[in-house]
Amino acid sequence: KHGSPGSYISYMKNKILTGLNKKDSHLNPFLQHIFLGYYQSDNAFPYMTSKNKLDIPMTEGSILNLDNIYSYDVVSLSNIFDWSSDTIVKTHARYLSQMKKGSSIIIRQINNHKNWIEIFNDYFTEDKNFDSYWQEHDRSMFYDHIRLFIRK
């Protein structure tokens, strides 16, 4: 919705080429998965092979249907708003405003430069350094922005 019509193929091509030109691109597990179909290291994502059992419950469905959003410390939204109208984003912002002070929302955006803080700013502040850091260090390569909003 927010990217230019017909722009996704060239967008992805440019992101992959940029990733290939980075130092140690051969170690990037996302590029390995694209070109090899597997990860060269069993430890590509250390949290997946942790000796400590991570008990993370799976939640499937709309975030708006969670009865206990206030109990979450972090909500991570990947590409959710890339295809959403401002009305839908405003609905989510109001709902997520139930989160406790200091909790965070991570918003990842593909082919989209809209800064959603304009809609969230009644409830959240943005850590702009977070986005700058991940624009430089994100190994997945595809995101234009990884924004961090912190509940006021």
Residue positions per predicted region:
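Adenosine-cofactor binding site in Rossmann-like domains, unifying the SAM/SAH pocket
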Residues: 47-66
